[in-house]
């Protein structure tokens, strides 16, 4: 007998920026950018919907964002606050199912297949969750409801912000057929271009290719796309998902104090970290810089983006932002390190369009 799964994907709307607008009424309705200082080689962690109208997006250099919208308000992230709010949201989700899989601070899958809440209706549960998040946390969330993780995630992005989309087995084929290939989960600029070159622009175009043909063009990720195009995704909601990190550090032969020299070394470290991410089929949201001084004391500085990254160029944009806020106190440095955490399995190994630095 076929399992009747009911999966909800909850995605908070412009999470960090929305928290700042909630806590600071003067920011409401204004283009707000959470991230680094545009005068210090910063990077955008996230931005409000008012800022997005100007073409600003996560992982964009702050200087570029400033040029697009000079009147934008730039503020530093308050990660401890965001983590606290995230726990509030996750606590609400856990009241509806013991199968909750957080993907990051601002999104999670919820398997309500066996839930008796709201008469067992996944749609009503999703609406109730959205209402509770708004009343209890003061933020909006978008929800996708479907019979597997791929479709639930695609659905949550369909009517942002503060929307809900339900994809049933009956309407799933039509939804997938019309879905632009660049919107498919994990399809980035490079994969999109490869598929466009063979005449694939929407989900329906994928149906004209066999699994073998897609694997020949895209490797293992061709199999994933073949299945996604047919509404197939058998991945389970995993509440025990282990958060791991990937990092590299170098102890220097001689202590240094020149920032440009540090940047050169960090660039090499970022390259090794990026290679490891690719080899392990991973992407991450949090970039952490570690600096150990010649008195053996060390500090770390982190930034968490809204979207996942793996490329060296993207990592270095964050690292340059982080090193700009380190107070060296005239001390020399003996060790440098970079760690990427909040990892997601990179099902299709390509950078996503919104993470491109080609601005």
Curated annotation (Swiss-Prot):
Chain positions of site Substrate discrimination: 16
One GO BP: DNA-templated DNA replication
Major location category of this protein: cytoplasm
Gene Ontology cellular-component annotations: cytosol
Superkingdom of this protein's organism: Bacteria
Keywords in alphabetical order: Cytoplasm, DNA damage, DNA repair, DNA replication, DNA-binding, DNA-directed DNA polymerase, Magnesium, Metal-binding, Mutator protein, Nucleotidyltransferase, Transferase
Active-site residue numbers: 107
InterPro entries referenced in this protein's UniProt entry, alphabetically: DNA/RNA_pol_sf, DNA_pol_Y-fam_lit_finger_sf, DNA_pol_Y-fam_little_finger, DNA_polymerase-Y, DNApol_IV, Rev_trsase/Diguanyl_cyclase, UmuC
E.C. number(s) listed in UniProt: 2.7.7.7
Positions annotated to bind Mg(2+): 11, 106
Listed GO MF terms: damaged DNA binding; DNA-directed DNA polymerase activity; magnesium ion binding
Localization per record: Cytoplasm
Catalytic activity of the protein: DNA(n) + a 2'-deoxyribonucleoside 5'-triphosphate = DNA(n+1) + diphosphate
Cofactor: Mg(2+)
UmuC domain span: 7-188
SUPFAM superfamilies cross-referenced by the UniProt entry: DNA/RNA polymerases, Lesion bypass DNA polymerase (Y-family), little finger domain
Cofactor note: Binds 2 magnesium ions per subunit.
Pfam families associated with the record: IMS, IMS_C
CDD domains: PolY_Pol_IV_kappa (cd03586)
Family affiliation: Belongs to the DNA polymerase type-Y family.
Subunit structure: Monomer.
Summary of the function given for this chain in its UniProt record: Poorly processive, error-prone DNA polymerase involved in untargeted mutagenesis. Copies undamaged DNA at stalled replication forks, which arise in vivo from mismatched or misaligned primer ends. These misaligned primers can be extended by PolIV. Exhibits no 3'-5' exonuclease (proofreading) activity. May be involved in translesional synthesis, in conjunction with the beta clamp from PolIII.
NCBIfam families (alphabetical): PRK02406.1, PRK14133.1
The protein's name: DNA polymerase IV
Organism, as annotated: Clostridium perfringens (strain SM101 / Type A)
Species classification: Bacteria, Bacillati, Bacillota, Clostridia, Eubacteriales
